[in-house]
């Protein structure tokens, strides 16, 4: 088993913003801990057979479950820097919403990343209303917290986009940066809607999961 890397191959300004917002750079990952998607993994047929192949009861997130099974059987994957797959990011918010809704639904079905999803619910359903209440009652304190939180929320995408839009005309660059919070919020809402649907499916199909 070996894992490679992937890079966005954008065709439009929107796709540059999308890729910068949702995809990590090579410098941001730890190769030994990286879990490749199906686009950037290579394995022998014997390894595939050893772990039972891709879980057919999953329509999304099946590659992560497959990764975990391979890692449990063979340990950390060798990382091949020169094996790079290029792909085009989603070109509109509708397609992006559907994609991340389905990813989160797959997480729920496979019981993946529960803490990560809980943090997201806490942020939007507890922390954000608290900050908005502060803005209503104590304007300066609320605005300070909102600005600090927004800075942390958008920091990494902004750092990526800064390099990816170097040399652009200022108006185009400003529009690209304005997309970051929109893309992040749309993706988070999609995940918060999709994850409980996956959990409900998992609860209703325990027999299917146990027999896999």
Where are these regions (language model features)?
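Short, hinge-like loop/turn segments at secondary-structure boundaries
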Residues: 16-23, 96-98
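Catalytic donor/gating beta->alpha subdomain of glycosyltransferases that bind UDP-sugars
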Residues: 55-114
């Amino acid at each position: 088993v070996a894992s490679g890397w992937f890079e966005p191959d954008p065709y439009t300004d929107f796709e540059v913003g999308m890729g910068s917002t949702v995809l990590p750079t090579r410098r941001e990952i730890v190769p030994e801990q990286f879990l490749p998607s199906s686009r950037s993994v290579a394995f022998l047929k014997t390894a595939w057979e050893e772990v039972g192949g891709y879980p057919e009861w999953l329509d999304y997130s099946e590659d992560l479950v497959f990764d975990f099974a391979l890692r449990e059987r063979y340990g950390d994957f060798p990382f091949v820097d020169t094996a790079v797959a290029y792909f085009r990011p989603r070109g509109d918010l509708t397609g992006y919403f559907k994609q991340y809704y389905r990813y989160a639904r797959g997480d729920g079905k496979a019981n993946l990343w529960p803490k990560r999803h809980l943090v997201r619910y806490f942020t939007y359903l507890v922390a954000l209303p608290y900050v908005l209440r502060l803005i209503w009652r104590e304007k300066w304190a609320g605005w300070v917290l909102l600005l600090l939180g927004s800075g942390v929320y958008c920091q990494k995408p902004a750092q990526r986009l800064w390099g990816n839009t170097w040399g652009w005309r200022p108006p185009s660059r400003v529009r690209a940066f304005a997309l970051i919070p929109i893309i992040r919020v749309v993706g988070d809402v999609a995940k918060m809607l999709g994850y409980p649907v996956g959990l409900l499916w998992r609860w209703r199909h325990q027999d299917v999961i146990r027999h896999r």
